[in-house]
Amino acid sequence: MASSMASNDFQLPPRFFTVFVSHFSSEFMVIPVSYYDHIPHRFPKTVILRGPGGCSWKVATEIKDDEVLFSQGWPKFVRDNTLNDGDFLTFAYNGAHIFEVSIFRGYDACKEISEVTELEEEEEDSVISLSSEDTDTGAKSEMKNTVPEGRDKGKSKVEVVEDSDDDEEEDSVYSESSEETETDTDSEFKVAKPTIPKSQKKGKKKEQVVESSDDEEDEEEDSDSDYIETFGQLDIEENSISEEDSSYAPDKEDTATASFVKPKVANKVANLKRKEAAKKRKKVDPMIKNPERYLDDPKNIHFETNVKNRLYELLVHAQLVKDYCLRFGDYVNYIDRFGKLSAKTAKWKDQRVCIKRWMRICKRNKLKKEDRILCELLRKGTFVYAIKLHVIRGKDL
């Protein structure tokens, strides 16, 4: 009788909400700290996101930098639901490894009704244990981190019970510093909430344009100087528009059509030390000798870079984009010795382009500070659809 009464007393926790911002939430999504009080202490490592119409997606949970977040599987949820900047999402944990998700489109605040079902075969769940006391099982696979349980409570121990994973990306170990983590968690994420635009017409693609101040444009040369650039000799002729790179072809021909719709997105995240840090940077001479010999086509546009503190994205120099009138779509493919990896692009007002998932490239290639990477741009005319990566180890320079 007592057990039945206890079960009847169970109530679903309240919902938490978030506004989708592609610059921060394309690869992972952080669960608010204030919601930790409403999820079980033994939190599953794999959960189901049940979207509009009962459609489901399997998503992994992780603890990074004292935060619980949705990681593997979240980018697929974003793509399948075509989330755009300004979309409003609510989440409620139902106590059975399932989050009920509602989506409200930013352009009209209407609730989404249904999407395509994308539920993968469930595997045996491991758990993230949230407990008020340390537990010592002696297992080598356990990692202990201290995170706040809630805004008004003390700190609790988080024990992540790791499962063996055959994924080569998980097996590879990349160590730079405690500040460089694959979660792309940056101080920008916690400083301020950017202003989100509302589209006037449904169905139009949105291109992320980050406003940069006049000061940033004035110091463009300094801010981009941490990337070592070596440009291939290329004459842009009218007939070059029809030429294709022979080494690789995009999956769909229509990807060569770039979107030029530029809503006014103002990113107001402050970086007070940007100007000071930019002045301290010094340009470094290219270290790769005769880079053309590494390229699939010596005439392709290319630039040289190495492992930086800013690991979560690759920067394409604004001057390079201007010189060759380069165009990028919403996604571009990295190509390395492991294959192809699709990554989202972020386009700045001053024409620099940032490409996400660079951390994963660094990890799976086990890059070190002394290594150099030659980035070869594969294109149709001026449209860049892929970046071929040639890794030259420090000992070979």
From Swiss-Prot:
Q: Where in the cell is it found?
A: Nucleus
Gene3D superfamilies, alphabetized: DNA-binding pseudobarrel domain
SMART domains for the chain: B3 (SM01019)
Classification lineage: Eukaryota, Viridiplantae, Streptophyta, Embryophyta, Tracheophyta
Q: What is this protein called?
A: B3 domain-containing protein At4g34400
Q: Where is the composition biased (Basic and acidic residues)?
A: 137-160
Q: Which residues bind DNA?
A: 14-107
Where does this protein come from, organism-wise? Arabidopsis thaliana
Give the record's keywords alphabetically: DNA-binding, Nucleus, Transcription, Transcription regulation
